[in-house]
Swiss-Prot record:
Keyword line: Activator, DNA-binding, Gluconeogenesis, Metal-binding, Nucleus, Transcription, Transcription regulation, Zinc
Biased composition (Polar residues): 14-23
Role: Transcription factor which regulates nonfermentable carbon utilization. Activator of gluconeogenetic genes.
Pfam families: PAS_13, Zn_clus
Keyword Methyltransferase belongs to the record: no
Residue ranges of every copy of the PAS domain listed in the record: 408-480
GO cellular component: nucleus
Protein name in UniProt: Transcription activator of gluconeogenesis
GO terms of biological process kind: cellular response to starvation; gluconeogenesis
Family: Belongs to the ERT1/acuK family.
Species of the source: Saccharomyces cerevisiae (strain RM11-1a) (Baker's yeast)
């Protein structure tokens, strides 16, 4: 039997319990709130309400039925710049039909196709376009830069390209690979009209790229050496000997008119005086380029005007128009133009031993015994360090070293193309690996003449500079780990016999992961006075 207090307590709690139960039932009986309609593009721009049907009443009244489509939903910040087809299906945004830009080339016969549709296709209203060229290999870095580019809008309108084309290879081989992978993909079962249209654009893009004239560089023949390898040049070229495995040094040639007409396909007019070569008397300036007039040809005019302030100007193409010059057959130089090719195609190390052997033979023929002893003494200083660093390296390590060399050289080539300093890159055995156009103009040797055979940097130096070369190499490569050194005077030999270019050379050394010298960059500046 309950006490009165207990009965009172039970009676007082019953109303609260029933109230809580009724409140829970009311929540369950509430209807779900309707989803908010997605506004169309026109209503979203004006920040007004819109209805679900298309076209909406507001667009009908204003005559905008053709453009009444759902406004695209904003992507998350970390997804901006990434193609929708690469996103998981669960996070792909709802987008209206895209405007697709077709790249046009002046040299393509198909450039006049669909001209009437170009005005509509070049309206870059879709967020599927970014305003910069592909400059990063990481999607995250490229996405970040695309956001910054859209904010500051510094790039030109012509640089706007679709992201779908940006992240897909444009050559025929890559297109076939992409097509096969897309057909075999388990995620895509039906091909939408939009994807079909995009595939047609890719095919047109690849066809236009294929119709572009091939770059004449590099030359597959070695006839450029028919007069540059000494008295037996013609016999050496006719024998078709491997100039990469056997060393034949470059030999300057006598020139009666102090010009390089003897090795030009289009010689300069012989009636033109050397003192009037591309000369602007109003500002005391010469205009140089790699095809008509180089710096060695101005030796005599500069001497005549040594008491006056004389300057030179280089004619060069835009860095954006310059292509990365690579050649698979040149193992000592840049072989591939993309990192993917470097890491997948290089499966053997580069042997520096033949280079050192031929370098020693060349030095024995050029210098006397006393000079050879001094050079060998400089080499002997870093020989123990070299052995200690490389004794534990395996075959796989050496393959990795060559991949690092090619990858580093690729980045340096991109950087060198943006500056105007004459630059030459050579390996630790002295074999020239890359030169830019400014270096061609400075010394008179073309890129093919220096890279189409085994060529050492000491071949184009005078005797005194070669002696300083080995002293500097010993200092910068194995004693001083600052990685830079300066040759106050470096005299370069030009193809014209007797013409020497006085320069100041700054060395920059790049090491590999084991501490060995990977490559040496030499920046050469002429000494005019």
């Amino acid at each position: 039997m309950c006490t009165p207090d207990e009965n009172d307590y039970k009676t007082s709690t019953d109303p609260d319990t029933s109230a809580n139960t009724n409140h829970t039932l009311e929540k369950k009986k509430r209807k779900k709130r309707k989803n908010t309609n997605v506004a169309c593009v026109n209503c979203s721009r004006l920040h007004v309400s819109c209805e679900a049907k298309r076209p909406c009443l507001r667009c009908i009244s204003k005559g905008l039925t053709a453009t009444c489509v759902d406004a695209p939903r904003k992507k998350s910040k970390y997804l901006a710049g990434i193609p929708n087809r690469e996103l998981p299906m669960s996070i792909q945004p709802d987008l209206p039909p895209r405007k697709i830009m077709i790249p046009i080339y002046n040299n393509s016969s198909n450039s006049s196709l669909n001209v009437n549709n170009m005005g509509e296709q070049q309206k870059f209203t879709s967020p599927q376009h970014i305003v910069h060229k592909a400059k990063f290999l990481s999607n995250a870095a490229d996405s970040e830069y695309s956001i910054l580019s859209n904010i500051i809008y510094q790039d030109t309108l012509s640089n706007k390209i679709p992201i779908d084309i940006l992240y897909s290879n444009t050559n025929s081989t890559s297109n076939s690979t992409i097509g096969n992978s897309s057909n075999n993909s388990p995620m895509v079962t039906n091909t939408s009209p939009e994807e079909t249209e995009m595939e047609k654009i890719r095919q047109l893009y690849s066809e236009q790229r294929a119709n572009m004239p091939p770059h004449p560089y590099p030359s597959s023949n070695q006839n450029v050496y028919s007069i540059l390898l000494g008295p037996n040049s013609a016999k050496i070229v006719a024998s078709q000997v491997n100039l990469f495995a056997n060393h034949f040094p470059l030999v300057p040639v006598d020139s009666a008119d102090n010009s390089l007409n003897f090795k030009r396909l289009l010689p300069r007019d012989p009636s033109e005086k050397s003192s009037q070569i591309n000369w602007d008397s109003s500002i005391n300036q010469y205009y140089l380029n790699s095809e008509t007039v180089t710096f060695p040809e101005l030796a005599i005019p500069l001497k005549r005007r040594k008491n006056h302030l004389v300057s030179v100007s280089l004619e060069s193409c835009s860095p954006d128009a310059a292509n990365i010059k690579s050649n698979v057959g040149w193992e000592h130089s840049l072989r591939y133009s993309t990192p993917m090719e470097i890491y997948t195609s290089i499966n053997a190390p580069f042997s520096h031993t033949p280079g050192f052997h031929h370098l020693l033979v060349y030095l024995k023929h050029r210098f006397n015994q006393q000079d050879l002893v001094k050079m060998c003494r400089s080499i002997a200083e870093f020989r123990p360090i070299f052995i200690a660093c490389s004794v534990t390296l395996t075959e796989e390590d050496m393959i990795f070293m060559e991949q690092c060399y090619q990858r580093t050289l690729l980045e340096y080539v991109k950087f060198i193309a943006q500056i105007g300093t004459p630059t030459c890159i050579w390996r630790r055995n002295g074999q020239i690996s890359y030169v830019n156009e400014e270096f061609e103009i400075l010394c008179g040797w073309t890129r093919e003449e220096l890279l189409n055979k085994m060529t050492f940097i000491v071949e184009i130096m005078d005797d005194e500079s070669v002696r300083d070369y080995f002293k500097t190499l010993s200092k910068v490569a194995y004693r001083d780990f600052r990685g830079s050194e300066k040759m106050k005077v470096c005299r370069l030999l030009s193809p014209i016999k007797g013409k020497i270019i006085h320069c100041c050379c700054m060395w920059t050394l790049k090491r590999d992961v084991s501490g060995l010298p990977l490559m040496i960059l030499g920046n050469f500046m002429p000494i005019l006075n």
